[in-house]
Regions:
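Hydrophobic transmembrane alpha-helices and their immediate loop junctions
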Residues: 1-151
Length: 151
């Protein structure tokens, strides 16, 4: 049961973090003048629209994975340079901000847990979920700062 709780927490955390990351790219591209992601149905917080099933399974079980890239057309940006910059930076910024938000939630989860005798699967899930939210947000932020195409 412990394995299942950990895999569930990891799956839900990576789903939330990657969905926020991809949505940020789509939203900022739209605000900069490119409706391509909206037309493709990708400007949504629905995780099913952003995930490659194999990439998600690989992420949960192998520790690495991928989501479908958000389609953008740079020619539609009102200001080409700033549109490209902000659309690319949006995922990193959202991951950084979400790590900043998820860390206090993780600290609260640890304080909420109490003593070892009182722990339940719900406590374990809450701790693991908030821990993975923070860790994935921060690691995606750092990983996406690496200067490799198409990050």
């Amino acid at each position: 049961m412990d394995w299942f709780v950990e895999m569930l927490a990891k799956f839900l955390a990576v789903t939330l973090v990657l969905t926020l990351h991809e949505f940020a790219h789509a939203f900022v591209a739209y605000k900069c003048g490119d409706p391509t992601a909206k037309w493709a149905g990708r400007m949504t917080l629905n995780p099913a629209k952003h995930f490659d099933p194999l990439g998600l399974v690989c992420f949960v079980f192998a520790g690495f994975g991928w989501a479908k890239p958000v389609p953008i057309n740079e020619a539609n940006f009102k200001k080409y340079g700033s549109g490209c910059f902000w659309t690319s930076a949006a995922g990193v910024i959202v991951n950084y901000l979400s790590a900043f938000i998820f860390y206090p939630l993780m600290v609260l989860a640890v304080r909420f847990m109490g003593s070892a005798e009182q722990l339940t699967y719900g406590h374990e899930f809450l701790f693991l979920f908030t821990n993975y939210l923070f860790a994935f947000s921060l690691s995606f932020c750092v990983f996406n700062l690496l200067p490799f195409y198409p990050l």
